[in-house]
């Protein structure tokens, strides 16, 4: 994000809350995926790759299960990323870094606004997924998605107000100009108890400011991370910026 705005808007999560109840794929229980008809509408399947960059979904051989904390039944499995996938994500972001940074801020703001519009279309399904995977009530799941939407609206407005200063110079015929510059590649880590909203607080602002980001969601809420990434990536892909946002 822009250097001077980093402190003001907190573009990185300050803490990582470790949640130790996630399970690797070792269970005799059948997956309950079919019991939740809203999952396919979010692009989810019984088995899902857990790493994304450059318009591609990838995964290694190790996997974990997403559980419904209400009854401890497995919902779906997610194949995890490898160290090599992580390096691929970094290289992909580096390859698109200059082009995204040099894109005018109002253009980036319009893309973020469209991300908010896409989230609006799927607010109900995402709220249900958050409720299913994390265990909070449905209205709070919807509220998390609304927080993301509201931050997209805020960020879109900010994209036209990030002005600098023109400072008088002691040299005749000269002046000094203050210009904000993006930080570059950043990481966003979110905890299990708020698997969606904190991403929005950080990612919407960082995108407008010209940063590229890698998201590390909580291991106990992987389906939420995948579903939200699918929504964000659809908008970015349509505008030719498939490597600005990665999930690993």
Predicted regions and their residues:
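Histidine- and aromatic-rich ligand-binding microenvironments
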Residues: 50-53, 65, 74-88, 236-244, ...
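Rossmann-like NAD(P) dinucleotide-binding subdomain of oxidoreductase/dehydrogenase enzymes
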Residues: 164-248
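Terminal low-complexity tails and localization/encapsulation signals of metabolic enzymes
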Residues: 2-77, 110, 114, 164-190
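Alpha-helix N-cap/helix-start motif
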Residues: 60, 86, 123, 141, ...
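Glycine-rich loop-to-alpha-helix module at the N-terminal edge of alpha/beta enzyme cores
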Residues: 73-162, 173
